[in-house]
A protein has these predicted regions:
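Non-catalytic C-terminal interaction segments of nucleic acid-processing enzymes
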Residues: 92-196
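Charged, low-complexity surface patches
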Residues: 2, 6, 57, 80-82, ...
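Acidic-basic catalytic patches of nuclease active cores, encompassing PD-(D/E)XK
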Residues: 1-37, 41-45, 87, 94-109
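Conserved catalytic cores of phosphodiester-cleaving nucleases, focusing on short active-site segments
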Residues: 13, 40-57, 76
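Catalytic cores of nucleic-acid endonucleases
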Residues: 55-105
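Short, contiguous strand/loop micro-motifs
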Residues: 1, 51-52, 139
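A cross-family signal for key residues in well-ordered alpha-helices
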Residues: 11, 15, 69, 154
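Short, well-structured alpha-helical interface segments that form or flank functional binding sites
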Residues: 8, 35, 59-63, 70, ...
Length: 196
């Protein structure tokens, strides 16, 4: 089975930022798991960097980078270095404060420096994102909902327990236990959550 080239490039980016002392989180979402998701989110003390990884430059990746500017101190686009540079795309990145990193043969080249957001509205980070695969093409990413469901399943195991008892004994992302119980019951009913 062939490995996803974007995932290979992302792994190189992860190694690069980790060599600079950053902790890297993968597939980090805004607003609880929506479509705005950074391939790599780097943290070092109070500094944060969002990195979008693609195999080629496009308006879509520039838009993705643009959306992360207010949620990290710096935002980068990471793409493979080609023979010719897309000077127009580089100018758009420069105009919008999005950094541009090129990668080829183990070497990273910063062609555009990002602007700095001094007080970003950073996303919630989860320990499980440390172990995720960045730029995976399987749609795998961590959300508060998925974490709640995993905790629910782990807590229940093979036991037959009252849902209200389970809810009151696990950490969840809902406003209160009543809304958690109602939401989870409806998710079980429509088959989003599978039970034995």
């Amino acid at each position: 089975m062939r490995k996803n080239p974007e995932a290979i490039l992302a792994k190189s980016g992860i190694d690069y930022f980790e060599s600079l002392g950053y902790t890297t989180y993968k597939e980090v979402s805004l607003k609880g798991g929506g479509s705005i998701r950074a391939d790599i989110f780097c943290k070092k003390e109070n500094e944060s960097i969002a990195v979008e990884v693609k195999m080629s430059m496009s308006l879509k990746i520039i838009e993705q980078g643009f959306k992360w500017r207010e949620h990290s101190n710096k935002t980068y686009i990471l793409i493979p270095k080609k023979r010719k540079f897309n000077l127009f795309a580089e100018q758009i990145c420069r105009d919008y404060g999005i950094g541009l990193l090129y990668y080829k043969d183990g070497i990273f080249t910063e062609r555009v420096q990002p602007s700095v957001t001094l007080e970003p509205k950073e996303p919630q980070l989860y320990e499980e994102q440390l172990l995720s695969d960045a730029s995976n093409n399987r749609g795998e990413f961590v959300t508060p909902f998925k974490l709640t469901i995993n905790r629910l399943i782990d807590y229940v195991g093979d036991n037959k327990l009252q849902l209200s008892n389970v809810i009151s004994n696990i950490e969840h992302h809902y406003k209160d236990n009543s809304s958690a119980s109602n939401s989870i019951k409806s998710m079980i009913k429509i088959g989003v959550i599978k039970h034995k």
